[in-house]
Amino acid sequence: MTLERDAAAQVAKVLSEALPYIRRFVGKTLVIKYGGNAMESEELKQGFARDIVLMKAVGINPVVVHGGGPQIGDLLKRLSIESHFIDGMRVTDTATMDVVEMVLGGQVNKSIVNLINQHGGSAIGLTGKDAGLIRAKKLKVTRQTPEMTQPEIIDIGHVGEVTGVNTELLNMLVQGDFIPVIAPIGVGPDGESYNINADLVAGKVAEALKAEKLMLLTNIAGLLDKQGEVLTGLTTEQVDGLIADGTIYGGMLPKIRCALEAVQGGVHSAHIVDGRVPNAVLLEIFTDSGVGTLITNRKRH
């Protein structure tokens, strides 16, 4: 009985701590980029789906943007299509783009939608091609060495960048109590498909919706200082300083720049969240301690 009471008391404590956050975020939109380990572990997948459904149940509006790089790589390998990367971006020729659309728009998207719906949500799967949801153009990549007088233009195929977001469609779905689940495939002016980094799509969607929060699930504990300790709260100015002094570097740079752009573009805060932690989304939103790094714009306070 004592153990049961202790467990009940812990639940009550958690709910009590969550209440002010729930009140604060009722009616607000949160854009969550879902990827990494959180998409691979069955326990974490189930927990993510429950978190999303609970958010909607208490009046918060989640919009999910998902990745799927490992799943794309697996199918390309099975089809004997070689993968090439330049600056961390997948070179996407026509054959690869077909696979990207099959995996992201089909297999991955529908599995996430199905999981959320199994837990009582009303999720709808979309790609950026649906109603021109994610408008895009070809990403221009250049490279220059000291020996070159002019930068070299590198063609990485159907890789794009976001030029616009159909917020009317997303707002209609959110107001209808649906949970949009977006595959990061954009559509060009002539109907061509583009493979776009999911972090970038999530950031642009959050910015276009003027979302309360952008949450990027990762496979790390958050932004780390040079001693390896998690930096729990930063302003955009502090993040700029950490980039300048080399604390933030390598593969984290594109993710952090995406978060910075979103906050500077009107999103109230961006979060780098440890997706390896069960119920990471709820812990970051509804508890005092959180499970990652919060980035805000000083000018908004």
From Swiss-Prot:
GO cellular component: cytoplasm
One of the protein's GO biological processes: L-arginine biosynthetic process
Site (Transition state stabilizer): K33, K255
Name of the top EC class for this enzyme: transferase
Record bears the keyword Transferase: yes
Organism: Ectopseudomonas mendocina (strain ymp)
Family named by the database record: Belongs to the acetylglutamate kinase family. ArgB subfamily.
Name the record gives this protein: Acetylglutamate kinase
